[in-house]
């Protein structure tokens, strides 16, 4: 049995990414919101176009998965984050609004049941997310978690309940997530990590049990291009530890996560070689 279960948040635990609703909540409070909303939509469209792989040429100049995601962070993710801060997209939010948005966020079916079952078995539960608001995540799943590691919207001493638009960054890259997974494995032992995107991929590859949930095309294309062992497991299908040990496990839903953790004999010594990254 695993000792720790670590999950990404947006798109893994949640039905939809919470970033857009978060920004729209802040922009909606402005007296003149149209221009700021258009700025946000423009940035969102640019990010989406930059994070969609059309063919293998998207990866061809990189020698490894690790070098690809490092470049993706520098050229796509960080410029977008800098725009979010410089344009003050997240200014003017109250802490209570962040909690409430988290409470209203729709979670994927069976997420809560799976987390509750794991807690009952004394498995440590962590959320590891590049989301901009830990307070939002607390509102959504705080009651199920031992630790949430994410970013924080900043407040000032003069107004400690209203966001400034600045962000205290802790987790912005795949490498940051990998570092935390290594800490969890070293501290607690056998660890499962579940994520849905390219930002999760190094942690997925390194965890004792690495699960890619959903159909994110960039993540799947990257795994194929860099020849990372990968196997899709469906409800009722067979999992063979001797064959599949070291492979990224592809699952479509939390019902499959529940079935996989509950019924499949899991490997006792899954430690993918770093040379595969």
Which residue stretches match the model-derived regions?
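N-terminal intrinsically disordered, low-complexity tails enriched in polar/charged
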Residues: 1-5, 36-42, 272-277
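Asp-based phosphoryl-transfer active-site loop
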Residues: 2-19, 204
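Residue-level signature of transmembrane alpha-helix interfaces in integral membrane proteins
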Residues: 24-31, 212, 224
